[in-house]
């Protein structure tokens, strides 16, 4: 019996070390950033069981077998649709401003289509204005409404939007609603999901959280887009979830969430529609390719029209494109670079691009919330401040609530607005969307919004920052080391 237990003990030890060696080899064989690989190895060797379980759950990008097969199957028809769209030459911009030219070329070559012109844009900075505009557009909808949100939180004005959407479905408008399973857990536990389905709305719970499948699909891969398309002509996107900030996370101690949304009319709705179509097919297996733009209603010839490129990210979409777009935008800046984000945990490449811009004379400003709802990200972001301040970057800490807007403005003309945070999760993991806008008028509007944010912020003083307590520096460096995993 003693011999038996000895053999079992040695087999357990051997299996344990073989498992660690196998995971270590897998980490080393994957082409990933060195800091990320080192962080995973440290966790695995300090806390082996916890580290191995964490790596198998979150260390690699698994969409899941069924969704991955759908993603592969949809691309032939999607590629044909994109190729057919190129025949609508009148919707594509032929020229761009000097500051936007490189970025638009990058997007065209990576995604297969160019930027579309003749769009009308409106920036909405108040949640009530967003909800009221959306309700009006839903009430006027005649054919179809598609929505996707990370969070739908019942209560307040969000319920009014839900009522208008159900009314549209009852009068014959084809309504589709896709919500992230983790972000919208309160919605799916409420009566609203059943009420909407009973009204005729197709409601889909995207990337459903299932602990039984934790090793088969990465559970922290989330559907983070916020998009609305109405009648293939009107579109919305930006940082705002379908929540009323007067009711949302009031106990978090960070104040009301401050967001920005763009309302658009024009052919950009078609390019956003194909993104939604891909998401819908990956999640449901059903193909809903949007129709081409209607020449009779698009304001193609209007001189005031905005030129827009839509960048989508996530499994099945061009890899690393949003990260490349941010780098290209930073290196294109000659005079001003203003960034707004709630979560700032940049890659080394993006950090260097921002610092380099400041060091070559560009006026660089980053606007972040002073209080953050994520303790981990809040501390990790502080670890980058010293390097940014030394390079001459201005860091503004917003004090009017949780600044949730995600925006970049380059030289007052090139704008990036959407759902992407400047952190690892948005850059390389989640399903995200960003609008790239080449227009000085829109840039002026965005600059006014950012100036308002700055007026409600406190400029971080470099000398005072360097005198912060030692314990804060230690905590910052600890979270900085694990920043590749956040």
Swiss-Prot record:
Signal peptide: none annotated. Belongs to the phospholipase D family. Cardiolipin synthase subfamily. ClsA sub-subfamily. The active site is at residues 224, 226, 231, 404, 406, 411. Keywords: Cell inner membrane, Cell membrane, Lipid biosynthesis, Lipid metabolism, Membrane, Phospholipid biosynthesis, Phospholipid metabolism, Repeat, Transferase, Transmembrane, Transmembrane helix. It is a multi-pass membrane protein. It holds the Pfam family PLDc_2. It catalyses: 2 a 1,2-diacyl-sn-glycero-3-phospho-(1'-sn-glycerol) = a cardiolipin + glycerol. It comes from Klebsiella pneumoniae (strain 342). The lineage of its organism: Bacteria, Pseudomonadati, Pseudomonadota, Gammaproteobacteria, Enterobacterales. It is found in: Cell inner membrane. Residues 219-246, 399-426 form the PLD phosphodiesterase domain. Catalyzes the reversible phosphatidyl group transfer from one phosphatidylglycerol molecule to another to form cardiolipin (CL) (diphosphatidylglycerol) and glycerol. Gene3D superfamilies: Endonuclease Chain A. This is Cardiolipin synthase A. Its EC number is 2.7.8.-. SMART domains: PLDc. The gene is clsA. InterPro entries: Cardiolipin_synthase, CL_synthase_A, CLS_N, PLD-like_dom, PLipase_D/transphosphatidylase. GO terms for cellular component: plasma membrane. NCBIfam families: bac_cardiolipin. PROSITE patterns: PLD.
